A protein has these predicted regions:
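Mg2+/Mn2+-dependent nuclease catalytic core
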Residues: 119-226
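Acidic, carboxylate-rich catalytic segments that either coordinate divalent cations
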Residues: 229-230
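Metal-dependent nuclease catalytic cores that hydrolyze phosphodiester bonds in DNA/RNA
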Residues: 1-132
Length: 230
C-alpha cells in the first residue's frame, strides 16, 4: 500500500487555455503563464517540423496520436496503482489496452520504489519563473522526495536526447517549493518502452536551473518576435 501525505494547503485552481497552439494556465487573478511543455517545445520546433516534412503529415499524425494515447493509458494505470486500486480491479479496468497494460506491468518493478506521495497530476505555477504545468508525481523515490515523471517510448532513449525532461522536472520542483516552501533536489525520469525495457534517470535539479532560465527567456523572446500574446 502506498502512503499518501496530506499537505498543509491546497494548490490554487488553474484554467488551461490554448493560444496559437501553445498551452497557457490562467490564474485566479486572470494572469496567464505558459506551460513548461509549451516553453520547451520552442527548442524542438525546427526538428519536429523537419521530421513531419520527411515522413509526411499522415504518418506524422498517426505516430503522434499513437504515442499520445499510449502515454495517456500508461499514466492512468500508474495513477490507479499509486492510489492503491486493487490489482484485480486495475487489471479489469485497463487490460483491454493491451500494449499500454503490458508496458505498465513492466514499469511496476520501478514503481515499487515510490512512496509517501505528495501530489499526483497536479497543476502548479511559479511566479518566479512565470511558467506553469501539470506534474505527474511528487513523492519519495528510494526515500528521497523527488519530482517523478513517467514517460513511454517506442525504444530506449539516450540521456543526451532527453534534456528537456530534466528541465521540465526542474520547473516542477521550483513550483512545488514556491507553493509549499519545501525543497526538492532530485528529478526522476522513469521510461518504459514498447520493447519491454525500463530506464531510470536521476538528476540534481541544480544542474538544470540555468537551462530552465535559458528556456523561459527563449520562449518569451519567441512570443515577442512572432507577435503572439498570452
Amino acid at each position: 500500500m502506498k502512503n499518501h501525505i496530506k499537505l498543509d494547503q491546497e494548490l490554487p485552481e488553474l484554467k488551461a487555455k490554448n493560444v496559437d497552439g501553445k498551452r497557457f494556465y490562467e490564474k485566479q487573478d486572470g494572469s496567464r503563464y505558459p506551460s513548461i511543455t509549451s516553453v520547451l517545445s520552442i527548442k524542438n520546433n525546427e526538428g519536429i517540423l523537419a521530421w513531419r516534412k520527411r515522413v509526411g503529415e499522415e504518418v506524422a499524425n498517426y505516430v503522434s496520436i499513437k504515442a499520445a494515447n499510449r502515454g495517456t493509458y500508461v499514466h492512468n494505470m500508474v495513477e490507479d496503482y499509486l492510489n492503491n486500486l486493487p490489482t484485480n480491479e486495475l487489471e479489469d479496468k485497463h487490460k483491454k489496452k493491451f500494449l499500454a497494460y503490458t508496458m505498465f506491468t513492466v514499469l511496476k518493478d520501478k514503481l515499487k520504489h515510490i512512496d509517501n506521495i505528495h501530489l499526483q497530476e497536479a497543476q502548479m505555477y511559479s511566479d518566479k519563473w512565470t511558467v506553469a504545468g501539470r506534474c505527474d508525481c511528487i513523492a519519495e523515490y528510494e526515500g528521497e522526495l523527488s519530482v517523478i515523471d513517467f514517460k513511454t517510448s517506442t525504444s530506449e532513449k539516450k540521456e543526451d536526447w532527453i534534456e528537456n525532461y530534466f528541465i521540465q522536472g526542474t520547473a516542477y520542483a521550483e513550483m512545488y517549493e514556491e507553493h509549499f516552501h519545501k525543497s526538492i533536489n532530485q528529478i526522476v525520469i522513469l521510461i518504459v518502452t514498447e520493447e519491454g525495457t525500463t530506464q531510470v534517470f536521476k538528476k540534481d535539479k541544480k544542474e538544470f536551473l540555468p537551462k530552465l532560465e535559458e528556456s523561459v527567456k527563449q520562449f518569451y523572446d519567441w512570443i515577442e518576435k512572432n507577435g503572439k500574446s498570452n
